[in-house]
Amino acid sequence: MKKLFLIIGAPGSGKTTDAELIAERNSDKIVHYSTGDLLRAEVASGSELGQTIKSYIDNGNLVPLEIVINTIKSAIEKAPKDIVLIDGFPRSVEQMKALDEMLKNTDDIELVSVIEVEVSEDVARERVLGRARGADDNVEVFNNRMKVFTEPLKDIQDFYSAQGKLIKINGERTIEEIVDEMEQVIKEKAGI
């Protein structure tokens, strides 16, 4: 049985870095995938599907749902470890519902917790525009990504809160503090 943890948060919240560090510290038990990495791997393969995905990502838009869900399900099932962290998902109510549906129809994956790394919009903007990592890191695209993140957020929080699965972590502290707390939560919930 794969134990799934979803790590959500605004662009620039640090969710990817946090999850990467936890997986590195616990490489014998935990594996981390960024939804973006899974999709970018497909893009890098140069496949027709990859080219389709690329056009969505380049414009800061969401990749079609069926593509994302199938990519995620496949990655979890093939994961070399039993505890899987995925960051950057779900990003919409539709994604959340489709993921929920997929999990209901899959016996070998259990969603344990959804961890939200909370940061203010000002902190997120400062971090993203200060890091200039790729072509999407300009103001207009940041604003689009922020809007894409915030619009469905309350519905996503409510959905997972009702299941007792939402855990919020303050993302405006040092990376050590954030990672230590998140790691503790994951280990506790996964029973390791």
Swiss-Prot record:
GO molecular function, one term: ATP binding
Domain free text: Consists of three domains, a large central CORE domain and two small peripheral domains, NMPbind and LID, which undergo movements during catalysis. The LID domain closes over the site of phosphoryl transfer upon ATP binding. Assembling and dissambling the active center during each catalytic cycle provides an effective means to prevent ATP hydrolysis.
Keyword entries, A-Z: ATP-binding, Cytoplasm, Kinase, Nucleotide biosynthesis, Nucleotide-binding, Transferase
Keyword Nucleotidyltransferase applies: no
Domain of life according to the entry: Bacteria
Stretches for region LID: 130-136
Subcellular localization, as worded in the UniProt entry: Cytoplasm
Residues the record lists as binding AMP: 35, 40, 61-63, 88-91, 95, 133, 145
Family indicated by similarity: Belongs to the adenylate kinase family.
Pathway terms, separated by semicolons: Purine metabolism; AMP biosynthesis via salvage pathway; AMP from ADP: step 1/1
Subunit structure: Monomer.
Catalytically driven reaction(s): AMP + ATP = 2 ADP
Species of the source: Nautilia profundicola (strain ATCC BAA-1463 / DSM 18972 / AmH)
EC numbers: 2.7.4.3
Functional summary from the UniProt entry: Catalyzes the reversible transfer of the terminal phosphate group between ATP and AMP. Plays an important role in cellular energy homeostasis and in adenine nucleotide metabolism.
Keyword field contains Transferase: yes
Region feature (NMP): 34-63
Name of the gene: adk
Residues the entry annotates as binding ATP: 12-17, 131, 173
Annotated NCBIfam families: PRK00279.2-2
Protein name, UniProt field: Adenylate kinase
GO annotation, cellular component aspect: cytoplasm
Swiss-Prot/TrEMBL GO biological process terms: AMP salvage
TM annotation in the entry: none
Chief subcellular location: cytoplasm
